């Protein structure tokens, strides 16, 4: 039986970045890795309602930098930046070096696989029908501009005695194309009938420039002004018609 490789792991160094960027001596590697896991676990619990998608950890010499990608930056920053300052102190205690926290806002959360999976899991825990939750997620993601999406849920769906797996797919999800920008995430929904697993694949287009384009993305182009009947243009046209009617009357 064929098995699928992790869509993000196979693309690391091709069109995907690692979630941790640092170098260490062989003796320090295990220590750094353990602290990274502790930081991720701490932030996941503390920022549970902040819609956090990704946590990037970097270790410049004698310091640490943590970049949090979230759809709700206001919850992380807090009033007048109080929460983020407290967060920096707590991360400094965990990592043992001065930690700097920066926020990366997610403009379109419907194109983020982790946030979509979280939304589906949250609905399942609130006893929303799994088919409705899946179809709603697929529609919202395709409406946001995705090229394709696949959603899969498995477990005792609808309280059934026997666990099963169901999935929906719309558009293209080319898992074998390495230049394809595939975002993948898994979540667990703890329901009264047991645990339901949620998997989401989102195809956001192809990255033709490789890692150079990922590390140095091109600035977003400004949209050209729409040509149409604006209020001023319409008034001007109506004015011209009025002038013509007045000329004919004369």
From Swiss-Prot:
Transmembrane segments: none
SUPFAM superfamilies for this protein: Prokaryotic type KH domain (KH-domain type II), Ribosomal protein S3 C-terminal domain
Example GO molecular function: mRNA binding
GO cellular component: cytosolic small ribosomal subunit
Residues covered by the KH type-2 domain: 39-107
Alphabetized UniProt keyword annotations: Ribonucleoprotein, Ribosomal protein, RNA-binding, rRNA-binding
Chain positions covered by the region annotation Disordered: 215-250
A UniProt-annotated Pfam family: Ribosomal_S3_C
Gene Ontology biological process terms from the UniProt entry: translation
Record field: compositional bias (Basic and acidic residues): 220-250
NCBIfam families: rpsC_bact
Entry function: Binds the lower part of the 30S subunit head. Binds mRNA in the 70S ribosome, positioning it for translation.
Similarity annotation: Belongs to the universal ribosomal protein uS3 family.
Assembly, per entry: Part of the 30S ribosomal subunit. Forms a tight complex with proteins S10 and S14.
UniProt-recorded name of the protein: Small ribosomal subunit protein uS3
């Amino acid at each position: 039986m064929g098995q699928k490789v992790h869509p993000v792991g196979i693309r690391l160094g091709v069109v995907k970045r690692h979630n941790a960027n640092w170098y260490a001596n062989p003796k320090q590697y295990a220590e750094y890795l353990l602290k990274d896991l502790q930081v991720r676990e701490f932030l996941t619990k503390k920022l549970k309602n902040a819609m956090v998608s990704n946590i990037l950890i970097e270790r410049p010499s004698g310091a640490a930098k943590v970049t949090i990608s979230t759809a709700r930056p206001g919850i992380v920053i807090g009033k007048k930046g109080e929460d983020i300052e407290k967060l920096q102190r707590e991360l400094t205690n965990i990592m043992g070096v001065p930690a700097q926290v920066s926020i990366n806002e997610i403009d379109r959360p419907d194109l983020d696989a982790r946030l979509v999976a979280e939304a589906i899991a949250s609905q399942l825990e609130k006893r929303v029908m799994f088919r409705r939750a899946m179809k709603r997620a697929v529609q919202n993601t395709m409406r946001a501009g995705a090229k394709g999406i696949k959603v899969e849920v498995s477990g005792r769906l609808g309280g059934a005695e026997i666990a099963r797996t169901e999935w929906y797919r719309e558009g293209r999800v080319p898992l074998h194309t390495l230049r394809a920008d595939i975002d993948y995430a898994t979540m667990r929904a703890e329901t009264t009938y047991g645990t339901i697993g949620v998997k989401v694949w989102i195809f956001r287009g192809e990255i033709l420039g490789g890692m150079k384009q990922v590390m140095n993305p091109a600035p977003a182009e400004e949209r050209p002004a729409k040509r149409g009947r604006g209020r001023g243009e319409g008034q001007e046209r109506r004015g011209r018609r009025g002038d013509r009617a007045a000329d004919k009357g004369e």
